[in-house]
Structures are given as C-alpha cells and as structure tokens.
Amino acid sequence: RVCFASMMQYDLDNGFPEHFLAGTPRVDNPFGKRLVEQGIKQFRLTETQKFPHVTFFYNGGYREPLDPKIEDYHLIPSDKVPTFADAPMMKASEIGKRAEEFIHSGAYGYGLINFANADMVGHTGNLEAAVQAVESVDQALGPMVEAVKAVNGFMVITADHGNADEMLTKNRVSGETEASTKHSLNPVPFLVYDPFYDGSYRLRDFAANQDLNLSHVA
C-alpha cells in the first residue's frame, strides 16, 4: 500500500491535499485583513502569472476576499506565448491604465499592484528582453505616479526578490559567463513617493545587519 503525501498542504480553503509532511505556516493578521478591519476599500490588480501573489500569498494562505464588499480582485489574462522573452511587455500597459482608472475613481483607499515583467522575463535569461520588460514597467509607472499625485495619495514601490537585475552569472565549473535564469540575492529597492509629505511620519530605522523582508514594509 502506497501513501502519497505532499511536502505541505497548499490549499487551505479546500483542505487539500489530505496527507502532507509539514504544516502550513499560519499568518493570522495579513495586511489586507488590517485594512478590512479599518473599513478601507482596496483593490488588487495584476495579470495571470502573479494573481496568487496578490491574493493567496498576500492573504496568508486564503484565496477569497475576507470581505467582498470592500475587496476587489482584478485579473488581466497573461499572453499565451512559449516564452515571455517573445512578449516582454506582458500586460504592464494594461495594468497601468487600469490602475490609473481605479486611483482616479476615488473609490479605493488602497491598491496592491504587481507587475510580473522583471521576474517572468528574467527567468528566460534573455538580457535584451529583460531590458524591454523593465522599460515597460517604467512606462506604466509614470502615469500611475501622476494619478497618485492628483488624488493627494502616496505610493510605495518595492519587490520581494531580484531577477532582471542580475542576468549574467559565472559558471562555477567552467568559470565562463553565462545567462542567469534564477532569482538574485541582491537587496531590492524600497521607494516611497509622497508629493505632499509634511514630516508627519518617518521610516523606521533598522540595524544594518538585520535580515529585512516584506513583513517589514507594513
């Protein structure tokens, strides 16, 4: 008799799989939940490749909104291509335009937006395509920044890991330079755009050797 078990239970909503080796870490107070408790209406926006990142992962392991009345999830279907090096712009433009609409609408107090380009195209190892991918995100961010300014808001730009920032690596065996298709271990940017900053808050100081991660953003 054979018993099949996964490394962990990856579908908490449906309790699947039934047999697993390690329990899933629980996140009892994800940031989205805090927003719901404050009654802040929010939108999540990305394309297919990163939809779980703005829903399942961001919610601490649950796919569905905690309160559908004030949480809107928006998905733009990704291009169906053999490799994203063939379409490095992906859906950055569409995501940017949709985000502008949501920001200008005045209906939301918070928005979570994920651009997939730098990661998905970075995985292809195609340097030229990666440059186009990053440029596409830059072009989408520009109008979003103006929209945020128009509604007296502020924006935080960051990432959970690098990829397109390091497209070449040295082969440990041959010593030759070759394409890198893996995540990098470099520190990621953390940018705050607040055109009306009045000194009412400041960024927390962390020790230089502290292991920082996304949980420190909020």
Where are these regions (language model features)?
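Feature captures the catalytic ectodomains and active-site-proximal regions of enzymes
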Residues: 1-218
